[in-house]
């Protein structure tokens, strides 16, 4: 299994040192912040060349969601995502992770009434995805549509929700990213959800049930990894979560070593 990581606060700030550190820890790739990639493109290219550590994907680094309630923010976000995809193409990255929105609204907390209809949600998100599908085709990249749990987003919560957008809009460059943390909240059976969407599953985020490092909670990673292997999943699985320990770097190394046994 190819395992990557996002940034952690205890990683070096210098870009080359960061890449060296991630590789030395034993990771196979780096999921970079989109803004860091765009603003320091030459440094990132040099770090990739020096270390041989690939940038797998980008996550974050733009302002405005593809399902944003504010149209100006949505359009601005699309342009920023476009630039990130262009930069990813320059460094050999696969694509960008994109949720409908994060923290914008939830039916689970007051006021519990959305300022936009469900039909309006579908139109806006679909319009955004069709636009990005063309950008991804032009740049040879992929948009990974991420379902979030019900407390962080109200539009796309399950892998089936993401699948519906892809199928109904006939999107060619959009795939699903399955995030174990969110899936543990939303899916009836995580392994079955992975299997049912194996044809569109392009990327995976991992954290344990409490959002901390794998191996410290209750998720059955062996079962989930076995499912991915049975389905011949070829993508990366990427650490996205916090680390809880007295010695953060050592705990991160231990988690990765443990995960390699799953």
Residue ranges and their predicted role:
Residues 40-58, 115-117, 141:
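Short acidic, glycine/proline-enriched helix-loop-strand junctions
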Residues 31, 57, 97, 144, ...:
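Conserved beta-strand positions in the central sheet of alpha/beta enzyme cores
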Residues 21-39, 59-63:
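N-terminal substrate-binding region of glycoside hydrolase catalytic domains
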Residues 1-26, 38, 92-94, 130, ...:
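Histidine-acidic metal/acid-base catalytic patches
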């Amino acid at each position: 299994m190819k395992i990557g990581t996002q940034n952690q606060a205890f990683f070096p700030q210098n870009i080359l040192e960061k890449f060296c550190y991630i590789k030395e820890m034993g990771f196979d790739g780096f999921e970079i912040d989109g803004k860091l990639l765009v603003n320091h493109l030459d440094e990132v290219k040099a770090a990739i060349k020096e270390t041989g550590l690939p940038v797998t994907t980008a996550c974050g680094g733009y302002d405005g969601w593809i399902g944003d309630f504010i149209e100006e923010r949505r359009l601005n976000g699309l342009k920023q995502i476009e630039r990130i995809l262009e930069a990813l193409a320059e460094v050999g990255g696969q694509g960008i992770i994109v949720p409908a929105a994060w923290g914008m609204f939830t039916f689970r907390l007051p006021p519990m009434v959305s300022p936009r209809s469900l039909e309006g949600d579908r139109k806006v998100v679909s319009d955004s995805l069709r636009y990005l599908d063309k950008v991804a085709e032009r740049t040879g990249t992929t948009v990974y549509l991420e379902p979030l749990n019900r407390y962080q987003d109200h539009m796309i919560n399950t892998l089936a929700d993401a699948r519906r957008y892809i199928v109904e809009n006939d999107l060619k460059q959009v795939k699903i990213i399955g995030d174990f943390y969110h899936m543990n909240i939303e899916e009836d059976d995580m392994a079955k959800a992975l299997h049912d969407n194996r044809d569109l599953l392009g990327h995976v985020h991992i954290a344990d049930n409490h959002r901390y490092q794998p191996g410290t909670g209750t998720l059955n990673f062996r079962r989930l990894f076995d499912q991915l292997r049975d389905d011949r999943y070829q993508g990366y699985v990427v650490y996205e979560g916090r680390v809880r320990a007295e010695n953060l770097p050592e705990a991160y190394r231990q988690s990765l070593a443990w995960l390699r046994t799953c």
